[in-house]
């Protein structure tokens, strides 16, 4: 059975666990006498082999407040691990990423609260998530979570960060707890029609998102609030097709795809000079993508697709048009002859005539008819960046090939 084959690949071995424990020993020595806990998928036993980020949370009394975490707590942690290979990262508040033996350890300051619904920062709920999941999943259930995570990774809908807008690890765990196993999740997801409500606990507020899973440890929060409708639809379609024709392609899609260039494709390569929070950068990138598409349509271009990909430092925006060539002039459709606005139209326009339909028309010059210029003007990044732009001529990297192909390999 395909699921058993996949599990052999993704389930960590005893050797893998020992390697992680060695890394954790180094961290434990550094954080000695602090109130800290290992959290995340490693602690819950739902982590994937060769895909390990360890989450270590350092807790401080809730009375010290959020500002304390950003300054004092962060400095306290840095002073203890400064001899290790570390970088600063940014979410709701800064945290530290330590790299030991190619294993990333996220060390996150948090506030110690009595229950998940008393959380002051988003990460304060984490130990309650861990407790809930470990008390509701047996060993087989953990393997079912692993299958669901790998399936979602394979089809590109895993990850709650703004760049992806997909399912978090916690969401996959709750789906398995609710439905029972991987296959049952797919069977139900294949029939989804939004709004979808999955209630392990009664919600404490009304949610408006397309997929609603109230958090069992904080029912005022929707665990899947960040999941986009596009990713819900993709998951539902993938579930339907996998159940019809199971294939390892869903879990590990082919990396090499070939596709010819259709239409005209503008490639914008952005290199960011400054480090910033991934969610902040990708919030601005997503706004840029929407703005570029709207602006091009307003100027008369027929837009096929606009997408972005990359990390926090190097980002590619691809713009696919039916054609990059557009006339310098365009037909401006005016009011009917009996309209009260005809004088205003005549005053503001040249080359005016009355059409056979009794409507006024004019010829107008476009303010801008170069797609590359329009696209560049509508990038709204607030950090400094360098840009390289060109029209695609030849087949390039696989991400561009995926953009051109559109159809995921698991679908066709």
Curated annotation (Swiss-Prot):
BP terms from Gene Ontology: RNA repair; tRNA 3'-terminal CCA addition
Reaction(s) catalysed by this chain's protein: a tRNA precursor + 2 CTP + ATP = a tRNA with a 3' CCA end + 3 diphosphate; a tRNA with a 3' CCA end + 2 CTP + ATP = a tRNA with a 3' CCACCA end + 3 diphosphate
Secreted recorded as keyword: no
Cofactor: Mg(2+)
Pfam families according to UniProt: CAA_C (PF21133), NTP_transf_2 (PF01909), tRNA_NucTransf2 (PF09249)
Keywords: ATP-binding, Magnesium, Metal-binding, Nucleotide-binding, Nucleotidyltransferase, RNA repair, RNA-binding, Transferase, tRNA processing
Enzyme Commission designation: 2.7.7.72
Transmembrane helix found in the keyword field: no
GO MF assignments: ATP binding; CCA tRNA nucleotidyltransferase activity; magnesium ion binding; tRNA binding
Gene3D superfamilies membership: Beta Polymerase, domain 2, CCA tRNA nucleotidyltransferase, domain 2, Poly(A) polymerase predicted RNA binding domain
More details: A single active site specifically recognizes both ATP and CTP and is responsible for their addition.
Record PANTHER family: CCA-ADDING ENZYME
Role according to the record: Catalyzes the addition and repair of the essential 3'-terminal CCA sequence in tRNAs without using a nucleic acid template. Adds these three nucleotides in the order of C, C, and A to the tRNA nucleotide-73, using CTP and ATP as substrates and producing inorganic pyrophosphate. tRNA 3'-terminal CCA addition is required both for tRNA processing and repair. Also involved in tRNA surveillance by mediating tandem CCA addition to generate a CCACCA at the 3' terminus of unstable tRNAs. While stable tRNAs receive only 3'-terminal CCA, unstable tRNAs are marked with CCACCA and rapidly degraded.
Name this polypeptide is given: CCA-adding enzyme
Gene field: cca
